[in-house]
A protein has these predicted regions:
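Alpha-helical transmembrane segments of integral membrane proteins
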Residues: 14, 18, 22, 43, ...
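Peri-membrane helix termini and adjoining interfacial loops of integral membrane proteins
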Residues: 34-35, 72-79, 168-175
Length: 331
């Protein structure tokens, strides 16, 4: 693997796509249409949304780079063929890349704040705060029993909810005109946040079990290292069961509220079944390969959930194209 391929792999493009879609789908298919239907005027233009999405994605990427840098000794044991820093790319370069990304993100935060004036200047404190917390996670908290997992999962849950900040006033004004529709859209954004939190928490718990050998060898005090994998499987299995119950409840709600049949069927096969299989796989897992299978199922849930959670998804597929065109036109 040459340096260029190593750098591309370092980007974790599938994960970054999920981060982008977690903001794009609920905003452009739920929150923004609800505001417009209530004769409101959304604050975010396509350009401003693009800046927010770019800042969010680059903040995530900066976290990945720093996390891989601090994990290079652990990765040398757990996944030696996938270790980038110190093997395919010089380790000091990681700090340079990370610093460059953080500078770009902070520059984007100033641009966003300028676009949104007058505002409460939330971009000027949200992005620096998230960058600091991700640094703290990679540097220290990742190797803690519980705190690290909850912190990074909470930050993932904030990704879709972040877009409620600039639209706070339009949401408040339109809630007097069409309260039910606007409140449903806001609730859907929160649902995305809760789903992102739970699925990422599950992914982090399973990853700790999967990475147990390297974590133990390098003194990383995760729950699996402190209490043993057999004990650590219990909270991971409980989280998986919670996700399964949440998805099952949503399927019942969709059925009772007239959701399209294809959405219910797709939700059953692409969300509920993988979550149930993941729950069973975690409780039965004995070796690393078993946890890796559960991790794949969780990624399927995370990706398909971005689309299937959207209760107001258009019945006509061409409406999706129309929404994308509206986004491009608003840039």
């Amino acid at each position: 693997m040459n340096q260029m391929l190593a750098f591309i792999r370092l980007l974790r493009l599938p994960n970054l796509v999920i981060v982008f879609l977690t903001q794009f789908v609920p905003y452009w298919f739920a929150l923004r249409p609800a505001i417009l239907r209530a004769n409101g005027i959304p604050v975010l233009s396509g350009r401003t949304f693009g800046l927010i999405a770019a800042a969010t994605v680059l903040t995530t990427l900066a976290g990945y780079v720093l996390n891989d840098y601090y994990d290079r000794d652990i990765d040398a044991i757990n996944r030696p063929d996938r270790r980038m820093w110190g093997r395919y790319l010089p380790a000091p370069m990681a700090l340079t890349v990370y610093s460059g990304l953080v500078i770009v993100v902070h520059g984007l935060a100033f641009l966003i704040d300028r676009e949104l004036r007058p505002s409460n200047h939330w971009p000027l404190w949200v992005y620096p705060a998230v960058s600091f917390l991700l640094f703290l996670y990679a540097w220290q908290l990742k190797c803690t029993a519980v705190v690290g997992n909850f912190l990074v999962s909470a930050l993932c849950g904030v990704v879709p909810i972040l877009l409620l900040l600039p639209e706070e006033r339009p949401i408040w004004l339109t809630s007097f005109i069409q309260p039910d529709e606007v409140h449903r859209a806001v609730a859907l954004v929160w649902l995305y946040g809760i789903f992102a939190f739970l699925t990422n928490l599950l992914r982090e718990q399973v990853k700790d079990l999967e990475d147990f050998p390297g974590d133990a060898a390098c003194g990383c005090m995760t729950l699996a290292v402190l209490k043993g994998p057999r004990f650590a499987k219990k909270p991971a299995g409980f989280t998986a069961l919670t996700v399964s119950i949440m998805i099952g409840t949503l399927l019942i709600f969709w059925q009772q509220t007239g959701a399209p049949d294809w959405q219910i069927i797709a939700g059953a096969f692409l969300l509920l079944l993988p979550s149930l299989f993941a729950t069973v796989a975690i409780y039965r897992a004995q070796v690393k390969k078993d946890f890796s299978r559960a991790s794949v199922l969780i990624k399927i849930i995370m990706f398909t959930g971005v689309f299937l959670l959207l209760r107001s998804w258009p019945d006509n597929p061409m409406d999706v194209v129309t929404s994308f065109k509206a986004f491009i036109a608003a840039l």
